[in-house]
């Protein structure tokens, strides 16, 4: 307790986190892209290489997963306007939201129905390519749909993949690995939903269940993989490859906006709200967005009040040296995908200058917004995916934030607010009914 009091004396906002209050923190250390980029340790060239790799795999994905064929084997999600939801939020919160609200439907991405279809699938493909190239079975000029042949399945079956997950990352890595032919083990934390485990098992994936939280599942997965030289551990806390898989979203969104005739520039700012668990997904996407839109995009991470690991780490500067449990928070939340007690130190340090802020919201708030979105727009998401939905109202309510960035009323009126919906497209009907019943 004494340590917590000392921490609060130095970092007053910790008091609100401990009290589980919905909290908004605008980052005083935010810099321009030019100043912040060197700290990421990755470049636009790295993201372009990831983009090219996904293009090489597109013919394979189009055949392996027919639902991706129409898009030519590219796994990408729609951007839709949600005007009725915007009005509903204004009414519920008594707060005008200037500009236009859009929803990025990663919740409905092909193959695994979440944002993790970006990073998780990309890292599995990267590993498969590396093994096949090293074995001389493939060149980068080949048509990668040859990977569907029995010879390749046989080759990949000598190797295994392991990952620790609260659910969605395990789902994307498990399904993709099993399809390639890898043996795959997913170490699931206590928060993981039963249907996600069942789906993985139906694909022939080994699921190891823990009574503990995410950190323990990752640690156990890492340990199990160390004893097997043919086992590759996908490390959600530290993986640059996962991060780059997410970062590809930036250029893709830029192309989608161009197609829609949507302008993003100094007088038409873009605000993006990303749900955050350990940080890899939102961190990678935010990095890609910064490369695509520069200083005209403003990124915010959203976390449950019971799992504010990234806000705690970045705000105190302690990063992965502190967990929410250290300040007496239980890390128990209905937003199972965000139930992480200790943030990625890699992501926190890489992105702390490129984030405009972080905020927390209550589980009940997520349930309420889940219900409103279903009623107003007919779109159904899982609780985690609603974390970003509270963002626009927080920004529009903060005159201090607007003044610090010198936003005029005209700029705010021209703004685009993009809510990144991270998952929910594959939630079973009965489970979704339970979610909807919890909204007010």
UniProtKB/Swiss-Prot annotation:
Read off the InterPro entries from this record: D_Ser_am_lyase (IPR011780), Ser/Thr_Dehydratase (IPR050147), Ser/Thr_deHydtase_PyrdxlP-BS (IPR000634), TrpB-like_PALP (IPR001926), TrpB-like_PALP_sf (IPR036052)
* EC class name: lyase
State one Pfam family annotation: PALP
Q: Which residues form the signal peptide?
A: none
Q: Which UniProt keywords apply?
A: Lyase, Pyridoxal phosphate
Single GO term (MF) = D-serine ammonia-lyase activity
Q: PROSITE patterns, per this entry? A: DEHYDRATASE_SER_THR
Q: Which cofactor does it need?
A: pyridoxal 5'-phosphate
Q: Does the keyword Lyase apply?
A: yes
GO biological process annotation, one example: isoleucine biosynthetic process
Q: What is its EC number?
A: 4.3.1.18
Query: Which cysteines link up through disulfide bonds?
Result: none
Q: Which residues carry this modification: N6-(pyridoxal phosphate)lysine?
A: 116
Q: Can you state the subunit structure given in the record? A: Monomer.
Matches recorded under NCBIfam families: D_Ser_am_lyase, PRK02991.1
Q: Which family does it belong to?
A: Belongs to the serine/threonine dehydratase family. DsdA subfamily.
The protein in question is named D-serine dehydratase
Species this protein is from: Salmonella typhi
């Amino acid at each position: 307790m004494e340590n917590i009091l000392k921490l609060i004396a130095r970092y007053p906002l910790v008091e609100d986190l401990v009290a589980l209050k919905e909290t908004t923190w605008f980052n005083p250390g935010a810099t321009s892209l030019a100043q912040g980029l060197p700290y990421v340790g990755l470049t636009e060239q790295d993201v372009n290489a990831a983009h090219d790799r996904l293009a090489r795999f597109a013919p394979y994905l189009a055949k392996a997963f027919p639902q991706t064929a129409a898009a030519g084997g590219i796994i990408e999600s729609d951007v839709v306007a949600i005007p009725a939801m915007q009005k509903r939020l204004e009414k519920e919160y008594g707060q005008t939201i200037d500009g236009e609200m859009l929803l990025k439907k990663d919740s409905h991405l092909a193959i695994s129905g979440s944002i993790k279809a970006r990073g998780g699938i990309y890292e599995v493909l990267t590993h498969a390519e590396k093994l096949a190239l090293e074995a001389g079975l493939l060149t980068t000029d080949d048509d990668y749909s040859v990977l569907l042949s029995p010879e390749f399945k046989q080759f990949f079956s000598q190797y295994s993949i392991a990952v620790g997950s609260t659910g969605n990352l395990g789902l994307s890595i498990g399904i993709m690995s099993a399809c390639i032919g890898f043996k795959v083990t997913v170490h699931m934390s206590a928060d993981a939903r039963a249907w996600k485990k069942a789906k993985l098992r139906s694909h022939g994936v080994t699921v190891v269940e823990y009574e503990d939280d995410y950190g323990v599942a990752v640690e156990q997965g890492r340990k199990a993989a160390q004893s097997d030289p043919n086992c590759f551990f996908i490390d959600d806390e530290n993986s640059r490859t996962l991060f780059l898989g997410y970062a590809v979203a930036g250029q893709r969104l830029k192309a989608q906006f161009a197609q829609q005739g949507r302008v993003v520039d100094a007088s038409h700012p873009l605000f993006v709200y990303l749900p955050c668990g350990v940080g890899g997904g939102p961190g990678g996407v935010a990095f890609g967005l910064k490369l695509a839109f520069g200083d005209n995009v403003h990124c915010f991470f959203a976390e449950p009040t019971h799992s504010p690991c990234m806000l705690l780490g970045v705000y105190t500067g302690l990063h992965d040296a502190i967990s929410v449990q250290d300040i007496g928070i239980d890390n128990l939340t209905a937003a199972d995908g965000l139930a992480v007690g200790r943030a990625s130190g890699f992501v926190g340090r890489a992105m702390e200058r490129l984030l405009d802020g972080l905020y927390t919201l209550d589980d009940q708030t997520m349930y309420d917004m889940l219900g409103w979105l279903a009623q107003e727009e007919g779109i159904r998401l899982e609780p985690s995916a609603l974390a970003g939905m509270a963002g626009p109202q927080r920004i529009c309510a903060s005159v201090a934030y607007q003044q610090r960035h010198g936003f005029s009323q005209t700029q705010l009126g021209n703004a685009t607010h993009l809510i990144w919906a991270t998952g929910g497209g594959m939630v079973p009907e009965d489970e979704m009914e339970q979610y909807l019943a919890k909204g007010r």
